[in-house]
Amino acid sequence: MITTEKKKKNKFLPDFEKQSIYSLRYDEMQEWLVEHGQQKFRAKQIFEWLYQKRVDSIDDMTNLSKDLRQVLKDNFAMTTLTTVVKQESKDGTIKFLFELQDGYTIETVLMRHDYGNSVCVTTQVGCRIGCTFCASTLGGLKRNLEAGEIVSQVLTVQKALDATDERVSQIVIMGIGEPFENYDEMMDFLRIVNDDNSLNIGARHITVSTSGIIPRIYDFAEEDIQINFAVSLHAAKDEIRSKLMPINRAYHVDKLMEAIKYYQEKTNRRVTFEYGLFGGVNDQLEHARDLAHLIKDLNCHVNLIPVNHVPERNYVKTPKDDIFKFEKELKRLGINATIRREQGSDIDAACGQLRAKERQVETR
């Protein structure tokens, strides 16, 4: 729930007149109902309308009294996302550009796999981490998203899938923004979509990725939720990583590894390292050996990413043969590694690219 105290802690949260009803966890909805003279069991009815029947209006919650519906309308907004652009790839990937109620835009991606449908969600409008290969950072950070705005991304995609009787089975928090810079809202989002009264998406079917905000890695290690954890690494040496990811100047690789080791000691869970391959920068066999040496004592997996070209950035794709050689070298050194399947290569698939293109149109 967005309280005054939470807004003070998170200065980048929006100051809307009404909170999104989707921002409330199940326990918070129960608490709110009791505080307003209602019975606790109404929370189950409300969540069923929101997440199973997926109604668009509080007035559609017909088994609630008119008085309760009015109280809900007086206090909460039904967050709606307006689809500005929808791009569909020949491989079935769909990229949405959504407009928020204050006019800002965000991206959400639906990816189709043999094992189900995965949604990549955004946690911030823009990003201030400044990764030099990423379109998300163009224009900087505008604000954080409420938990309800993150939930609404999944719900909006799920409503689109309802027409073909499909469901969202996996969530990856790898869209625009640094999730650990919007930590409390991200955690509320995770608990909402994981709740069996809500979308009931299993914790092990959800992955959160960070650029390496070390204090929050320690916090995340203490959370009682079995979410998959990924770290955008991209280089094993500080010199290269600092050029790719300026955040590394604050959180050096050795300190990042200490935090990850702590996370594994606390959770006994595997970590995925995301490693984007940039031609002539971090894609040589010596870089593979540096990486293997850095992570050899960790329970981990390396996800090698053939990067999407971003016109505003100067990096180039590593040739396919070199990608395979890099993977082979890691495996030779005992590291579990795979090459991520490229999806959406014929649309604006790079993170933040579609939003950046729309911003260019707006400013012409």
Curated annotation (Swiss-Prot):
Sequence positions that bind [4Fe-4S] cluster: C127, C131, C134
Active-site annotation: E107 (proton acceptor), C351 (s-methylcysteine intermediate)
Domain Radical SAM core: from-to ranges: 113-346
EC number(s) from the headed UniProt entry: 2.1.1.192
GO MF terms held by the record: 4 iron, 4 sulfur cluster binding; metal ion binding; rRNA (adenine(2503)-C2-)-methyltransferase activity; rRNA binding; tRNA (adenine(37)-C2)-methyltransferase activity; tRNA binding
Record-level GO cellular component terms: cytoplasm
Top-level division of the source organism's lineage: Bacteria
Family annotation (Gene3D superfamilies): 1.10.150.530, Aldolase class I (3.20.20.70)
Keywords tagged on the record: 4Fe-4S, Antibiotic resistance, Cytoplasm, Disulfide bond, Iron, Iron-sulfur, Metal-binding, Methyltransferase, rRNA processing, S-adenosyl-L-methionine, Transferase, tRNA processing
Gene Ontology BP terms: response to antibiotic; rRNA base methylation; tRNA methylation
Pfam families found in the cross-reference section: Radical_SAM, RlmN_N
PROSITE patterns the record matches: RADICAL_SAM (PS51918)
Family under the similarity heading: Belongs to the radical SAM superfamily. RlmN family.
Function in brief: Specifically methylates position 2 of adenine 2503 in 23S rRNA and position 2 of adenine 37 in tRNAs. Confers resistance to some classes of antibiotics.
Protein name (record): Probable dual-specificity RNA methyltransferase RlmN
Taxonomic path: Bacteria, Bacillati, Bacillota, Bacilli, Bacillales
